[in-house]
Amino acid sequence: MTQISPTRLHSPLDRLLVEAQRALDTVFGNPPAERPNPAADTPDVVLDPEQRRHAAGLMRINHVGEVCAQGLYFGQAAVARDAHTQHHLLEAAQEETDHLAWCADRLHELDSRPSLFNPVWYAGSYALGALAGLRGDDWSLGFVVETERQVEAHLDEHLETLPQNDQRSRAILRVMKIDEARHADQAEQAGARPLPAPIPSAMALASKLMKTVAYRL
């Protein structure tokens, strides 16, 4: 993936090209992970067709979640007012790139593919991130906290509902969950603003729709 660096000093055209390249890398590329795959030392097992289909559906949801996280963070970083906030967002995005690569690897192992709607998921998340960022960095960080808490919840659900013998997927999700919790904690420490009640509910509803579609497509 294109090196993630602050964009504040770039010209408007440079920034547009950087954002376009990030979108292409996230949606259509195969970004390499900086950290080793957590499942590397976990032996694979033979899953029956139904188990494989279910595991692939869950990992596709998790892959979409990382596509959305990239869009959200890049949208927020593009309009961040404070250099420290922008750095925090881009640093979190880099770790989410690891998650994206790990989920893509696992989908390949399961003979499956990413969601056909990834361009839509990314565009919607980028727009949401930019809108949140325009309200102020405290709002932007508030969206980070709520997003990561909701992701933690669905990772817990997936850890429970994956096929019992699919330990490779579990190894990936456990590390992802640790990272997401840390991102939320760091955003809170950086001055995140609690979001008004209707916003988390709307985010949860949108997430439910995404998961329903991504599980199959």
Swiss-Prot record:
Biological pathway: Cofactor biosynthesis; ubiquinone biosynthesis
Membrane topology of the entry: Peripheral membrane protein
InterPro entries: COQ7_proteobact, Ferritin-like, Ferritin-like_SF, Ubq_synth_Coq7
UniProt xrefs under Pfam families: COQ7
Assigned EC number: 1.14.99.60
Similarity field: Belongs to the COQ7 family.
The protein, known as: 3-demethoxyubiquinol 3-hydroxylase
